Amino acid sequence: VGAVALSGAGIVTYAIADPSAPADAKQEGRAPAVHTLKLKDRGSGRKGLAKQDTDRFSAVVLTWTDPEARAKGTPEVRTRDIETGKWSGWQKITAEPGQADGEEGARAALRGGTESVWTGDSDGVEVRLVSADGTEAAGQPAGMDVKLLDPGTDPEGGIRPAAFAAEETTAPATDTPVPTDPATPTETAAPTETATTTDSPTPTEEPTATGTPTDPASPTASPSPTVPAPRPSTVVRPPVITQAEWGASTDYDGTPEYGTEIKAAVVHHTGVNSDNSLSCGQSRARMRTIQQEHFARGYFDIGYNFVVDKCGQIFEGRSGGMDLPVRGAHDVGFNTDTVGISYIGNFESARPSRAGLDAIARIVAWKFGMYGIDPTGKVTLTSGMDQGVDGNKIPMGQSVTLPRVFGHRDTNSTACPGANLYPKLTRIAQTAKTPGISHALATSDFNRDGIDDLVAGTPRALSNGGTLTVVPGGLDGPVAAARRTLTQNSTGVPGSHESGDNFGAAAAWGDVNGDGYADLAIGAPGEDDTSGHADRGQVVVMYGPALNTGFSYTTSGSVTATGARLGSTLAVGDFNGDGKADVFAAGTGRGGNWNARLTGGATTSGTLTTATGAVAYLDAATGDFNRDGYADVALNYRDTGGIGRVVRFAGSATGLTKAGVISVKGGRAIAAGDVNGNGYDDIVIGQPVASESGGLSGGQITMVPGASTGFTTTGMTTIHQDTANVAGGNESGDLFGASVSVGDYNADGFADALAGVPGEDFPRGGVNQSNAGDVLLAKGTATGLTGTGSIRVSQDTTGVPGSAETGDLFGSAVSLTDLSGYGRADLTLGAEGEDGTDGIVLYLPSNSTGLGYTQAVIHSKTALGTPTDAHLGQTLTP
């Protein structure tokens, strides 16, 4: 129950009821609250609020008494930062017509108002409403106020997602060693993998058929307070952050109403510019302010059924049952029998991310799978509101045929969901129809705080026994103070530390047990088994968020065990589309070997070549290369003849199969992402040595586009140091492309490529700094990679700490990953030869205006606690 108190003349404060979860232990808990300040009458109907001190808040919304009245002019607000004491510039606040209808739309508690605007932590406010000429606008509605929304602190993390817990109908399955291989090491941690009733694409009961893609026109059923029975879906439920987990108030003003089914999905955006600069680490707080906004407008609860962010997090919106046809308040006249999904951001200006689009498609597919709906079909809906009321474009009782996935603008006079998101609705529908749509969403977030996390492997540490350091991402990048070091002697890690194990030689993130937290796969290719097979190799999987339970396994099938070195490279993705990620591993021994382990332990394995010698430079990348919804794998290696190769493995309902070697030569590194923005993941191959790839003597990177058949050379692009607009020049031994990573650093919707050049020399003062190293960032475009706008970074770059020195090997490993949650991939760069062979990792953030050189941070062995001579910066994940 919310406590109501007067807090000075004209100010009303009420606290939103806290969820039952305890407050975050890392900081003093603060309950959410809303502080209401009445705007002052300035004569002739003009209203505003002069600068004044306030209680703490992070968002604002303007409201007024009459829900049908409209504010005159443009509402604007500016706020004072609680830390710096500086006042912001004026922010425009968009008026938002009410979207509730039916009984909820007739409530006396409804108020007119605006959308809420995120301000960040503030303690001062000023409000004005201005005309086009800059003067104060007259004729404002009565009862106008500004509500200061304080989201409080996040509830404590680590709660098991109710979405998955609710699906458990049997005891969790225990991972067991592969039964066909008696030499497989026993799993030491007795892990469990979440059992769900919807793992299989086969429905548990027959869904309602739709007959044809277009339903006949019929009046929309009246909503009912009766709670219908949940329906099973043909699609596995995606991981959803529940209301309890994001800290929703349960002080609902009423009870939910229900339709009879879900017929369509309506896609929205929050439409606020400040949401574009929000970190995904702040999305839970933003959810609480959106709920506060909707409460302030008089809604029963948050109006949307689901909300997603640019990192692909999915949030439960309106209460009443995620698997039920809950009537929302998101599209007046069309709230019944639709599911409303809002994307945090203003997509009139921002571009939607691949992760955000995939998250929407997963929700659509799951909800539609309950009713046998084709996401790419059409539906005829009947308007339940008079034309012109709150923007509704369709007269009461009139039918309109719409795509099953449509935008708010299709039925309402609004730009929502924005000029950049609206054209993506067809792709969302197509993705929702793919056979592998039940796939686990890609994640590198082990603590589920909304921000991807970094792994620095040091397999050469401690006499090559190996260690691994997990560094959580944060609002300012990797948080070294919160690091976790894992060895084979760490609590819960299977096995024991031994010289030569090379624990941490490879690592990969993914949600293996389907609980929403990223789990960590770790390679130890030098591990010996207990049956006398030296260097057989081992893969260890540790469950997030604690990373203190897990399991291990080794080679299986007919692969020669001795010298296999399984775990030399790893990739994690949902190869069979069952909602839980699977693990791919490869080893160098006896012509090379590979192993794909599905959830539950079923394993497929084989050899890469028929040679008896060892292959080299294994590197794996996963992505959906043919856009069928199943994760695929591209594996780079150098064969025994010294030639680089890339072999494609295709995902399907039965798992991963070896499709064959592609025509483009391999190199020493590989990465995946959608470079040309067409929805197919592409690969970028690092080809640093000419004799292996047939490329330039100093090295190159080659982007190979994904296609419905796997890969195509049509549209293939190559970047090297002699490419137009690339700084520097080709020199033998530069090792351009020795490491490579793919990510969207400028949030333009095209993945970019980051290439390490650890062999680059830097002459300084007449002295050549040999193998000092640097990196090149090449931009992605609709036609592939380009040298135009490319950026070179070294330790001699202005603002970057340190200096280029002989043997630093800057660029020995690279990661182009968003470690701050702002939707732009940051640069994380390894220099394993820095400070002798101690090594460093340098973090360089990507800002809205470019790279933040002055915010670059070096993480040394002191900061990360790695041993001396550990070669920190040799491997980075993701």
Region spans (language model):
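Short glycine/acidic-enriched loop and turn motifs that connect beta-strands
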Residues: 459-463, 526-531, 589-592, 638-642, ...
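Acidic/hydrophobic-patterned starts of short beta strands in beta-sheet-rich repeat architectures
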Residues: 449-457, 514-523, 577-586, 627-636, ...
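Basic/polar, cationic surfaces and motifs that engage anionic cell-wall
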Residues: 143-185, 191, 195, 203, ...
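Beta-propeller blade termini
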Residues: 438-448, 457, 504-512, 567-575, ...
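Beta-sandwich interaction modules
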Residues: 12-13, 44-56, 73-76, 81, ...
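C-terminal region of N-terminal signal peptides and the immediate post-cleavage residues
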Residues: 8-35, 433-440, 449
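Blade-edge motifs of beta-propeller repeat domains
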Residues: 432-440, 472-502, 541-565, 596-615, ...
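A detector of repeated loop/turn-to-beta-strand junctions in beta-rich toroidal repeat architectures
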Residues: 463-469, 480, 519, 533-538, ...
